[in-house]
Amino acid sequence: MPAALVENSQVICEVWASNLEEEMRKIREIVLSYSYIAMDTEFPGVVVRPIGEFRSSIDYQYQLLRCNVDLLKIIQLGLTFTNEKGEYPSGINTWQFNFKFNLTEDMYSQDSIDLLANSGLQFQKHEEEGIDTLHFAELLMTSGVVLCDNVKWLSFHSGYDFGYMVKLLTDSRLPEEEHEFFHILNLFFPSIYDVKYLMKSCKNLKGGLQEVADQLDLQRIGRQHQAGSDSLLTGMAFFRMKELFFEDSIDDAKYCGRLYGLGTGVAQKQNEDVDSAQEKMSILAIINNMQQ
């Protein structure tokens, strides 16, 4: 069915605390055949700036991300599932997870909250019926979505998105050093393609997600600045770009694991000879130390 003819309620499932476990059961089945996952988050903006001396502007960008992710809470997560051809499962293909968030108690940027409210987010419902992040993390760990080498993650300018995901999965602050962040990221998300990073090799493509979608003649389903709709559009953009600019083959050595705007951004194993079990054990030790 053409995207323009699809109602968002037919393909995007709203997930709250009441239906979380039921929908995660469906995802455990879906990911077996649809292992390309486009992801987007909504979060309450940027509220602080790091102070002190920084090794470089790139180091500053990571410290900016780190201090804000540590202070703030994720509001929404969108996950869209496709196969390697960009084909969707029949029916629902996108899940929009709505997390607990309290405008009275939690920190936020007013401009960001106004934007999200104008985009249709229901903050009263987030407070009363939102998902507990710890419960979600427990279910995600055993979902077949993270910690799996065969799952490919698609994102757009996603440093903050993955920052919030690492915080959620580790239940701890982000590591002080960017290279430690990428080690942990690689454990949970072994294969990441950031569409904004891919755009560096796509002549004339520029701007944010909606601008890119317009240039690629893609039809949005749902509302902009909602995580489900944005994740769905991110997946569409990836597969259209892969076809138009990369001859349906993306060079992993050049693009996989690179996040736009963060350092070298390589979330890949440094040495293919390193035993992966030992690598994962060392990363888990880092996480354990962070939680203590």
Curated annotation (Swiss-Prot):
Its EC number is 3.1.13.4. The lineage of its organism: Eukaryota, Metazoa, Chordata, Craniata, Vertebrata. The keyword Cytoplasm applies. One of its GO terms (cellular component) is CCR4-NOT core complex. Belongs to the CAF1 family. Has 3'-5' poly(A) exoribonuclease activity for synthetic poly(A) RNA substrate. Its function seems to be partially redundant with that of CNOT7. Catalytic component of the CCR4-NOT complex which is linked to various cellular processes including bulk mRNA degradation, miRNA-mediated repression, translational repression during translational initiation and general transcription regulation. During miRNA-mediated repression the complex also seems to act as translational repressor during translational initiation. Additional complex functions may be a consequence of its influence on mRNA expression. Keywords: Cytoplasm, Exonuclease, Hydrolase, Metal-binding, Nuclease, Nucleus, Repressor, RNA-binding, RNA-mediated gene silencing, Transcription, Transcription regulation, Translation regulation. A divalent metal cation 1 binds at D40, D161. Component of the CCR4-NOT complex; distinct complexes seem to exist that differ in the participation of probably mutually exclusive catalytic subunits; the complex contains two deadenylase subunits, CNOT6 or CNOT6L, and CNOT7 or CNOT8. In the complex interacts directly with CNOT1. Interacts with BTG1, BTG2 and TOB1. Interacts with BTG4. This is CCR4-NOT transcription complex subunit 8. GO terms for biological process: miRNA-mediated gene silencing by mRNA destabilization; nuclear-transcribed mRNA catabolic process, deadenylation-dependent decay; nuclear-transcribed mRNA poly(A) tail shortening; positive regulation of cell population proliferation; positive regulation of mRNA catabolic process; regulation of translation. It is found in: Cytoplasm; Nucleus. Pfam families: CAF1 (PF04857). A divalent metal cation 2 binds at D40, E42, D230. PANTHER family: CCR4-NOT TRANSCRIPTION COMPLEX SUBUNIT. GO terms for molecular function: 3'-5'-RNA exonuclease activity; metal ion binding; poly(A)-specific ribonuclease activity; RNA binding. Transmembrane segments: none annotated. Changing E42A: Impairs deadenylation and decay of mRNAi-targeted mRNA. InterPro entries: CNOT7/CNOT8/Pop2 (IPR039637), RNase_CAF1 (IPR006941), RNaseH-like_sf (IPR012337), RNaseH_sf (IPR036397). It catalyses: Exonucleolytic cleavage of poly(A) to 5'-AMP.
